[in-house]
From Swiss-Prot:
Organism: Danio rerio
Binding site for S-adenosyl-L-methionine: K18, G19, R20, H138, N207, H208, Y259, Y260, F261
Coiled coil: none
Catalytic function, reaction form: L-lysyl(4)-[histone H3] + 3 S-adenosyl-L-methionine = N(6),N(6),N(6)-trimethyl-L-lysyl(4)-[histone H3] + 3 S-adenosyl-L-homocysteine + 3 H(+); L-lysyl-[protein] + S-adenosyl-L-methionine = N(6)-methyl-L-lysyl-[protein] + S-adenosyl-L-homocysteine + H(+)
Designated name of the protein: N-lysine methyltransferase SMYD2-B
Top-level taxon of the source organism: Eukaryota
PROSITE patterns named in the record: SET, ZF_MYND_1, ZF_MYND_2
Sequence positions that bind Zn(2+) 2: C66, C69, H87, C91
Leading EC class: transferase
Binding site for Zn(2+) 1: C53, C56, C75, C79
The keyword Zinc-finger is assigned to this record: yes
Amino acid sequence: MMKAEGIPGIEQFASPGKGRGLRVSRAYGVGELLFSCPAYSYVLSVGERGLICEQCFTRKKGLAKCGKCKKAFYCNANCQKKNWPMHKLECQAMCAFGENWRPSETVRLVARIIARLKAQKERSPSEILLLLGEMEAHLEDMDNEKREMTEAHIAGLHQFYSKHLDFPDHQALLTLFSQVHCNGFTVEDEELSNLGLAIFPDIALLNHSCSPNVIVTYRGINAEVRAVKDISPGQEIYTSYIDLLYPTADRLERLRDMYYFSCDCKECTTKSMDVVKMSVRKRSDEIGEKEIKDMVRYARNSMENFRRAKQDKSPTELLEMCELSIDKMSTVFDDSNVYILHMMYQAMGICLFTEDYEGAVRYGEKVIKPFTVLYPAYSMNVASMFLKLGRLYIALDRKLAGIDAFQKALTIMEVVHGKDHTYVTELKQEMRDF
């Protein structure tokens, strides 16, 4: 049995008011790697099939497909062989169910975790500090809606995997799905596109702060923890669990809903950025508190309505929704208000999808400057925005603007991904090609 030997420079400790946490035993500078953790289990998003290797998450052309289901793609025979213990859970089922094979990403990940747990004889390299079974589940905090969703996931697991997997009892499944809900990571690329879902037990020990001193990024199927501030010996390390663009009330609501806790970091107690994030238009008539409150309610409803509409509305209808809400919000909010920025960012995404590059640039240019003010210094949200803009400028033959945007993205990426990361070397190559 592999013992919990620890990670050099990192200590687990009882963090006051937060339960378990991690702190450093030596100093770390900005951009320095604190530690990395291989995924315990992971699954590639269906939308990325054919573009990324199912085993190592390398993006490349000319991947070889599985001869049986023709739906899984690999770098080579070696990757395919390594992935078989997991792919065999799905290969025959995909052939049998055909178009009706539709388990959620969460269900697919849990199936793989169950298979891994069954085959596992000793502590894995993903569990140097924390065993998978020791992760928080928060079963007692689940409301009826979450419980129903979990029951639906369990039904999906039985429907799609019962032929190839022996399941633990119902209570154990409830716990496992809850653990994945609270501790699962969305693996993202340099443009923050969703590549898949994974579980990293050791990374789950990181507590949250809205003013984080580390960031979690990905190198293939490994998660890496890098410093985004200078960290002194004895300091706790914090990452952010959520998008930090929004004002304090919104962040706290999201943390309570998703992770069952409230944050008391400096940013949440001082609310120092809220005035800037909620900037109001300068008008000849005074804008009253009620008008602002009503518009905040409208903005939050618009965001939720848009999120739901993405499932079934056409790009044209979605863009119209964005434009209508931006116009209405603009009567009260300034263009740098986070609710307007949110809808502009969505509008940019639709323009990219429909290949309206001029439209995408128009929205992107409105968003990028406020982003650099409202997000922390080394933010993937800012880097990915500069990257997208850079690629749009190049496509529109605006090379100087493209190189400038790439350079700004690179400054952030070298810190959050590391100077030797493929994303960084590929971007440098892209810049040299011009």
